[in-house]
Amino acid sequence: MNSKDSNTVPVYTTNTGCPIFNPMAAARVGKGGPVLLQDSHLIDVFQHFDRERIPERVVHAKGSGAFGEFECTDDITKYTKHTMFSKVGKKTPMVARFSTVGGERGTPDTARDPRGFALKFYTDEGIFDMVGNNTPVFFLRDPAKFPLFIHTQKRNPQNDMKDATMFWDYLSQNAESIHQVMILFSDLGGTPYSYRFMDGFSSHTYKFVNDKGEFYYCKWHFITNQGTKGLTNEEAAALDGSNPDHARQDLFEAIERGDYPSWTLYVQVMTPQEAEKYRYNIFDLTKVWPHKDVPMQRVGRFTLNQNPTNFFADIEQAGFSPSHMVPGIEVSADPVLQVRTFSYPDTHRHRLGANFEQIPVNSPKCPVFNYSRDGPMNVNGNQGNWPNYPSSIRPLAKVQYEPDEGHEKWVGQVTYHMDEITDVDFEQPRAFWQNVLGKKPGQQDNFVKNVAGHLSGAISPVRERQYGVFTRVDSELGRRIREATEAEVKKMEEKAPKPINKGEPHMFQGSS
């Protein structure tokens, strides 16, 4: 908030630089007379005020972030030619944004929800965005389901309230979601203590390409150096009321006092030959690559050491997209990732404008030359007098690219495909229940309690269907979820006043 010269008090001006006598005074006819339209400053203030809000993100609306740098600590040039990893010790500036997913900008940081984990690297060859979550999997693997799923995480269109029946109705009909559900309703995955104490994941499978044109499949893991820490349902609920900005405050204050948070990047790498023989579909967003199958390899470390100067300019206007790629890193055949490469920049153009890449936080540090021109809010010189077409007089050079043609040849007929549910979809959720939660004292009990408290708000047919999904994971889990949930339902029914039906039926009336 300080001026450039701390000894000089800035003069208040209009947005065009004209000094103003008193910003809180209005031109009027006498002391008590009407306001005059000639007071252009007053008119400008209100016109700008009327336009201060931009559309919030349709997902990940509530978030926080900071600036920092990534340092390469280990050589992976045999996998990728990307300049960020070109040599050990190489440093790359970056900005990070962490967020909840389903809520609006005003919702609590401690809501049970996945957390967004978005990173923007200002590399020598352009912007590279890694747009992940704090969970290694997601609720779906068929991209057409994404908007429908997100609708169920939002509000009931009739009463604009969160609705447990909507939430579980979708999940119980789409059982591939169960792996993410298991993580979400654990204390670590669904209610992390704060952004500093959670890991981040690419979730998707990406491709590394080296300087020989050879490619490898990879998954990215950002492991917090602060250690993971979660909240119980009760702790999260208490913070919801006492400090809904808890995670934002924790991140900001830690950086302000010099306690800079950091994360270590590891990758899992698989050759195309290994991928063809692997027991799981490597493009399935609902599954992980077990570390015993594909070991983690350390790559580097990023540290956040600078808070935003202005939240709106630096964080709210930041636009992250999986389509922001650089040489040496490419999109795989993961269908959800491929659709995200369209959806994310599209929503930024709606939210921030056609030239959102020119906003300082979104601008690359390297030169930009192409044939894109004009459009609203084009403020970077519009590439001067360079031709806006492929010119023989002032040509642009082209980089060399020789793809590996030995793999990823796709031949087939056009079909409308949706993956079917099989027993394989329950293997990893079962391992999470038995081998992860089962080895941490109290975590299975907390999981059952967390699910029961939420699922009890859904109508009976939806609850029954979801019990069946949990039973396919583990019969004991299904039994415990059913007993705990129905006990919660009974308590709610005993406390609830008798309903009075008037007018039109609600969205789910008659279904229970």
Swiss-Prot record:
Catalyzes the degradation of hydrogen peroxide (H(2)O(2)) generated by peroxisomal oxidases to water and oxygen, thereby protecting cells from the toxic effects of hydrogen peroxide. Belongs to the catalase family. Pfam families: Catalase, Catalase-rel. Its main location: other. PROSITE patterns: CATALASE_1 (PS00437), CATALASE_2 (PS00438), CATALASE_3 (PS51402). Its EC number is 1.11.1.6. It is an enzyme of class 1 (oxidoreductase). It is found in: Peroxisome matrix. Residues 488-505 have a biased composition (Basic and acidic residues). Keywords: Heme, Hydrogen peroxide, Iron, Metal-binding, Oxidoreductase, Peroxidase, Peroxisome, Phosphoprotein. GO terms for cellular component: cytoplasm; mitochondrial matrix; mitochondrion; peroxisomal matrix; peroxisome. This is Catalase. InterPro entries: Catalase, Catalase_AS, Catalase_clade1/3, Catalase_core, Catalase_haem_BS, Catalase_immune_responsive, Catalase_sf. The active site is at H60, N133. GO terms for molecular function: catalase activity; heme binding; metal ion binding. It catalyses: 2 H2O2 = O2 + 2 H2O. Its cofactor is heme. Heme binds at Y344.
